[in-house]
Regions:
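Structural alpha/beta surface segment adjacent to cysteine/selenocysteine redox centers
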Residues: 24-127, 132-133, 202, 222
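Extreme N-terminal starter segment of soluble prokaryotic enzymes
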Residues: 6-12
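The canonical Cys-X-X-Cys-His
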Residues: 19-22, 181
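An acidic- and aromatic-residue-enriched active-site/binding cleft used to recognize and process polar
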Residues: 16, 49-51, 186
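Aromatic-flanked redox-active Cys/Sec active sites in thiol-based oxidoreductases
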Residues: 13-19
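Basic/polar N-terminal segments that are highly enriched at the extreme N-terminus
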Residues: 1-6, 225
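C-terminal cap of thioredoxin/glutaredoxin-like
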Residues: 26-34, 121-225
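A generic fold-level signal
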Residues: 6, 95, 175-176
Length: 225
């Protein structure tokens, strides 16, 4: 089984909303797309790589708090922060938030893009518990491209969950990690332009050895070609 190749003008991105590395990667991708004047020619098609299922555990807050200071320095404009809400409200699951993005895809890939980034920032910047339905809907209400009533109905009846999970189960073995990009020409790359490692065991922290944001310009151009 191989990952599906998207059509020209589309970049498939396999990730989890709870992954800050994917959040940085998508931010850089959107920035490159805008800078190159290709907002109307290149779109992201979100695929799920559900980390809580892969790891059979929720993402620990300690991992989050180790990653955010490192990632935040690479894109200070995102205003990512350590978790600053009550510890009891830490979102132990991102399955519902990811489901919301896949439900929004039935409206448009553009709507899914907007909701995905809004939910990421609600988590990583605003410390909101995106495991909760009302929080997901409240975030969706800030997204101009999303039909919130249709999204709410889709989440109530679970219409997107089945197809999302089938796709995840079918392709998880081919995804190298979050984020994993697939281009229309078949090129694939995990966490573009970046090489990192972890120092220490429990309580360790990530070290970025290489980081080249310019690779996103090439990815966008290739997708549009």
């Amino acid at each position: 089984m191989t990952l599906p190749t998207p059509p020209v003008g589309t970049i498939a991105v396999w990730s989890d909303i709870g992954c800050p590395w994917a959040t940085l990667a998508l931010h850089r991708l959107y920035g490159a797309r805008a800078r190159l004047g290709l907002d109307d020619r290149v779109v992201v098609d979100h695929g799920l790589f559900l980390l809580e299922d892969v790891n059979e555990a929720p993402t620990r807050r300690s991992t989050h708090d180790a990653e955010i200071p490192v990632i935040g320095t690479r894109a200070p404009e995102l205003e990512l922060t350590l978790w600053h809400a009550d510890v009891s409200t830490w979102p132990v699951s991102t399955a519902l938030a990811n489901e919301a993005v896949h439900a929004a895809k039935s409206q448009s890939l553009s709507a899914a893009e907007q909701l995905d980034m809004a939910l990421r920032l609600a988590f990583f910047r605003d410390s909101r518990c995106i495991s909760l339905l009302h929080e997901v809907i409240t975030v969706a209400e800030t997204c101009s491209r999303v039909d919130v009533a249709a999204l709410s109905a889709a989440l109530d009846d679970g219409s997107a969950r089945g197809s999302m999970m089938r796709s995840y189960r079918m392709h998880a073995g081919e995804v190298q990690g979050s984020p994993h990009f697939v281009l229309p020409d078949g090129y694939e790359v995990h966490n573009p332009g970046m090489s990192l490692r972890w120092l220490g065991r429990a309580g360790g922290f990530p070290v970025i050895d290489e980081d080249d944001p310019s690779v996103y310009d090439d990815l966008v151009r290739r997708a549009a070609a």
